Amino acid sequence: KYGYDFTKLSLKKNKAGSIYAVSYRSHNAIMSYSPIFDAMVEGMESMVQKDNYKLKVITFYEKRDNLEHYLEDLRTTDCVGIILFGTEMREEMVRPFLKLPFPVVILDAYFENLNCNYVVPNNRQGAYLATDYLISRRMKQPGYLQSAYPLRNFSERLEGFYHAVHDNGMSRSRCIIHQLSPSIDGAMADMLAVIDRGDALADCYFADNDLIAIGTIKALRLRGYKVPEQIAVVGFDNISEGRIIDPALTTISIPRHYMGQVAARELLSQIEAPRQHTCKIEVSANLVKRFSV
């Protein structure tokens, strides 16, 4: 009678089903640092809520939980799509998720042999930026602070590091590499052991992540080294602790909130209009210059 259109009101109701964000923990060495994980989840949530779905975050522990039972339970839930944190996963553990009857987007890891949708950080580019900056400032052969726990992300960062070393006319074989635990306390303890053994130290280092970089800086300072005057360090991830350590950490920033948004957007697109082709989206990195170089 009055010409009102009530059709839009129905669109605001929650849609049937939930988006599941699955955090897969194998050794828990990386995902246990929650701020990076939380930022990606917050990004997902902002997109999912706009589309009136619910987001449920669940964690699978490889050493404790049974994957077959876990996947069977997922089939009987209200799940309509999965965003799978691939950070700590191996290819053989991903395959069963791709057999589920709903779309999957893999976040924070890429598996060349699996046909799936991916949203990943551009690790090679970020590591290249960091290493090239180190070399331009120090004019010396850089070293590498490598995680003692291997991850695909770290392998890609090593490739970017070596690419920058090569492009600057330096030899890969001359790079000093220390394997350290990927946590602040663990890296500090491991680096103290490196120093106390009298191992050769590099003039500057790129670290697999900020936790390793911060632990290394703490160890160097405990043993009387001045950072960056004697040894420079660049991290990766731009975590909040890097801003408050002395000296503040030069690092690589990845927009994790945005990564979560993009992953959710891709999944929602697949739910609304399934397509045969898949894509890999790489989110670019930025160099954040502070005072550790």
Task: Provide a role label for each language-model segment.
Residues S26-A39, V57-D65, V119-L129, L145-L192, ...:
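Hinge/beta->alpha junction and helix N-cap segments in small-molecule ligand-binding domains
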Residues A16, Y133-P142:
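Glycine-rich phosphate/diphosphate-binding loops that line cofactor/substrate pockets in enzymes
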Residues M188, L192-V293:
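Flexible loop/turn connectors
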Residues K1-K15:
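N-terminal helix-turn-helix DNA-binding module of bacterial transcription factors
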Residues D5, V80, M139-P142, D203:
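Short acidic/polar active-site loop segments enriched in Thr and Asp
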Residues D5, K54, P103, K140, ...:
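Residue-level detector of anion-binding/catalytic polar loops
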Residues A16-D132, I195-A200, L211:
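Alpha-helical recognition/docking segments in bacterial nutrient-uptake
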